[in-house]
A protein has these predicted regions:
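Non-catalytic cap/lid and distal C-terminal segments of serine-dependent acyl enzymes
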Residues: 1-110
Length: 110
């Protein structure tokens, strides 16, 4: 379960490339998934319960581009995942995460 994230490491470097830094690349899901061609890894993702959620309210705008880019990557690779957008009143804040986490845990039976 990923809540209100930024999934492209370039955001933290003013949208510049991260060069040859493999650690940064592997922690940039929007890039890593697009470039993943190993069927074994893709199958592992397909077997997982993946939920990615964002709000559309205050302080969420910085992560929206990478949210939608990651969603497109999952769709392209046929990796099932629940990409959920909450309303414009839903901010990047603990108040909302405390509501979202129990909601999603309950939704997957935990």
């Amino acid at each position: 379960i990923a809540l209100s994230g930024i999934y492209d490491a370039r955001y933290f470097n003013h949208h510049q490339d991260y060069g040859n830094d493999e650690v940064v690349y592997q922690n940039s899901p929007a890039d890593y998934i697009w470039n993943q061609h190993d069927g074994w890894f893709i199958d592992k993702y397909r077997q997982a319960d993946i939920i990615v959620c964002t709000g559309l309210g205050d302080w969420e705008q910085d992560g929206l581009d990478s949210f939608y880019n990651l969603k497109r990557a999952f769709e392209e690779k046929n990796i099932p995942a629940w990409f959920d957008t909450w309303g414009t009143d839903v901010a990047h804040d603990w108040v909302w995460w405390r509501k979202q986490m129990p909601f999603f845990l309950h939704s997957i039976g935990l």
